[in-house]
């Protein structure tokens, strides 16, 4: 039993009270962006709200985004994992979870993230964001043929004047340099 934590309890209570206003501000494109301290308070307040309402999928997804913005891998991964467990068909939850896993320093997380991205590509091979994340993950995992295939699919989907095309074409060229002569045919 510990005493003297009044200040920490007060900070927690303030964060919980401020969370709705901070969230509104974070979602308003015209409002000032939240600084890191405000984002931390938002995360604390959101975690408290989600303890009261653990089935709030959108809340878990938003907490995952806040965790990513803070660079807090455990908050992001845990929040997205919870959202994904609640609704595996929710594309925002699945893609957020895959992104958090692929950014992890744990090779097993990277593998799981790659598997989830492969599932997402099979489900919707016209989602540019999914294809992009899949391609970069495949490249990082040295699966260069898969990366090239995903980037080529993106080129088919993007308009001719899209500025991303040049980056994708350079990425394809870089991946092709890593392929063996038999693979690049």
For each predicted feature, which ranges?
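Long, contiguous interaction/recruitment modules in multidomain scaffold/adaptor proteins
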Residues: 1-44
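Alpha-helical adaptor scaffolds
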Residues: 26-35, 39, 57, 61-124
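Alpha-solenoid helical repeat scaffolds
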Residues: 44-47, 81, 118, 152
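Residue-level signature for tetratricopeptide repeat
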Residues: 49, 66, 100-103, 137, ...
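Structural marker of alpha-solenoid helical repeat scaffolds
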Residues: 52, 86, 123-124, 157, ...
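Alpha-helical linker/edge segments of TPR/alpha-solenoid repeat scaffolds
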Residues: 104-111, 173-185
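TPR/TPR-like (Sel1-like) alpha-helical repeat modules
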Residues: 139, 144-162, 170-173
